[in-house]
Amino acid sequence: MESTAYPLNLSLKEEEEEEEIQSRELEDGPADMQKVRICSEGGWVPALFDEVAIYFSDEEWEVLTEQQKALYREVMRMNYETVLSLEFPFPKPDMITRLEGEEESQNSDEWQLQGGTSAENEESDVKPPDWPNPMNATSQFPQPQHFDSFGLRLPRDITELPEWSEGYPFYMAMGFPGYDLSADDIAGKFQFSRGMRRSYDAGFKLMVVEYAESTNNCQAAKQFGVLEKNVRDWRKVKPQLQNAHAMRRAFRGPKNGRFALVDQRVAEYVRYMQAKGDPITREAMQLKALEIAQEMNIPEKGFKASLGWCRRMMRRYDLSLRHKVPVPQHLPEDLTEKLVTYQRSVLALRRAHDYEVAQMGNADETPICLEVPSRVTVDNQGEKPVLVKTPGREKLKITAMLGVLADGRKLPPYIILRGTYIPPGKFPSGMEIRCHRYGWMTEDLMQDWLEVVWRRRTGAVPKQRGMLILNGFRGHATDSVKNSMESMNTDMVIIPGGLTSQLQVLDVVVYKPLNDSVRAQYSNWLLAGNLALSPTGNAKKPPLGLFLEWVMVAWNSISSESIVQGFKKCHISSNLEEEDDVLWEIESELPGGGEPPKDCDTESMAESN
C-alpha cells in the first residue's frame, strides 16, 4: 500500500527594504570555519545557511512521508553546498550535523531492502538520493575571488579576530571599511535573529540626517547600521522630523480627509484668526466647518464636524492646542504650623460637642463667568507662547455662595447678581437669587444666607450643635455674623490664609467639575448654532435664565460620594483616633518636634478664632 503523500512547500520569502537580524544561537561547533562570500554591486553581504533553511517540528516531521523526508534532506544538503561554494566564515549548522548522523546510521542494507521489496511487485519509484560530495561541491561553482583582491583579510584562526562591541552584526567586525568594532569573543557573539521590523524615532533619524549632510548617505548608513535608502527617505522629510516629537516613529494616517475642501477652508480660517490675535478653540473650528458644509450643500448626516474630525484635521495640518498655564496658589512658609493649629481647633470642637456628620458643613462664594473664556487656543506645533485677544466680557460674572455637608448633601445655591435689581425672567427653581451693586458678598448678604439657607437646611435641629467651616473673608468673621451663628447653635471655624486649596472641601472636590460642566454646556450651546447676533455681528451673551440653568445642572451633577470623600480628605469628618495619628505625623515634621495633642476648651477656641 502506498503511503499518502503530503505536499511539501519549500518556498523562501524575500523581504525587501527592511533590516532584520537573525536570532538563533548556534552551539559551539568545530574550530574550522568555512568561507562564504557574496559580492553584490561592489558591497559585501553575508550569506547564512539559516536564510535558506526550513525547519519542521516533531509533529510536522511525523506527518511527512519517506519520499518527502528524502526530498527535504536532499534540498537541505544542496542549499548547504551552495552556501559553501561562497566564501564567508560560519560554523557548520546543527541541521547538517544531524542529517549526516542520520545518513551514517542508515546502512546501505536499508536502501537495498526497500529496493528489493518494491522489485517483487514492480520497479521501485523511490530511489536513494544522490548526495553530492562535500569535497567536490565547490567544483560546481566558479572559484570565488580571494578577499585580498578586495583589500580585505579574514583571519584563519578565531583567536586572531579583533574585539568588537555588542549590538552590531558580526560581519561588521571582519574588516569592512567604515566600521571600528570590538568584542571579547566573536564565537560567543556569532548569532543572528529573525525578529520584527526595526523602527527608529525622530531623534535618531535627525542624528543620521545631520551626519549624512556632513559626509554622505553611504557613510551615514554604515556609521549607524541602517539602509542607505532609509537615509535618503529621512533626508526628504527632515522638516517634519524637526517639528515632530523626538520619540515619534512614523507619520502614518491619511494625508487628506474625506472633505478636503472643508479642511482647507477651516485651516485658512485658523490662520486668519491667528493673524488677528484672536483665540481659536476647537468649538469655533467645528462651528466654522458646519457653516462651510452648509455653503457646499453637504448633508448634515454626511458631515457632523465632530470632535474626532477636529482632532484628525489638526493632526493633518500640524496644529495643536495651547493651554494657559494656571497660576497655583503659593503656600505659606509656616504651612506646618498653621496645619497643626487648624487641626487642633477642629479636634477640640469635635471632642467638645460631638457633632453629627450631617451638622458639619463648608460654605464659600465663588465667581462664575457668564461668557467663559477658553483656556486653550489652536496654534501651530512648536510655536512659542502666543498672545491672544479676549472678547472683553469675561468680567461679566455672577457670584454663587455654595455649601455642602459632611454627609454628602448640597445646600441650595445662593446667587448674587450684579446690579441694583433682579431682572425679570424665568429662573430655575432650587436656588436663592439676590443682587448687589458690584455683585459681591457682603456682611448683610452673609446674614441673609444664614437665615434662608443654613437655618433652613434639611436635618437642622435647634438642640443639635453644628460646625460651619469658612475661609478668611472679612465678611465672614464680623461680630454680627458670629452672633447670628451663635443664635443658630453653630460654631465657626476659619481656614488659615493661603490654605484654602488644601483644607476647603469646595476647592478640593467641587469647583473644578462645576466649572468644567458649565463650560461644556456653554460649548454645546455654541455648537447648536442658534445664538443671536448683535448689530455689529458679534455673538450675544447667553440669556441669564439659561446660564443659571447651566449652573443648576452643574451643581446637581456633583456626586455625594465625592463630597463625603472631600470632608475625609480635609480631615474634618474622619475618625478621631485617626485624626490623632495624622496630627502626630504633622507635628513630627515641625523643626522642634511637637507635643501630643491636647483637648482645648471652647472658650480658648473662640478666642483663637
From Swiss-Prot:
GO molecular function terms noted in the UniProt entry: DNA binding
Q: Where is the DDE-1 domain?
A: 353-567
Q: What is its main location?
A: nucleus
SUPFAM superfamilies of this UniProt entry? Homeodomain-like (SSF46689), KRAB domain (Kruppel-associated box) (SSF109640)
Which intervals of the chain form a coiled coil? 8-28
Q: Name one GO cellular component term.
A: nucleoplasm
Q: Which residue range or ranges hold the HTH CENPB-type domain?
A: 250-323
For region Disordered, the annotated ranges are 1-28, 100-127, 588-609
Q: Which cysteines are joined by disulfide bonds?
A: none
The answer on whether this UniProt entry bears the keyword Amino-acid biosynthesis reads no
Please give the CDD domains that the UniProt record associates with this protein: KRAB_A-box (cd07765)
What is the name listed in the Swiss-Prot or TrEMBL entry for this protein? Pogo transposable element with KRAB domain
The KRAB domain is annotated at 47-118
Give GO BP annotations, semicolon-separated. Answer: regulation of DNA-templated transcription
Q: In which residue ranges is the amino acid composition biased (Polar residues)?
A: 108-119
Q: Which InterPro entries match?
A: aKRAB (IPR003655), Brinker_DNA-bd (IPR018586), CenT-Element_Derived (IPR050863), DDE_SF_endonuclease_dom (IPR004875), Homeodomain-like_sf (IPR009057), HTH_CenpB_DNA-bd_dom (IPR006600), KRAB (IPR001909), KRAB_dom_sf (IPR036051)
Subcellular location as annotated: Nucleus
Q: Does the keyword tRNA processing apply?
A: no
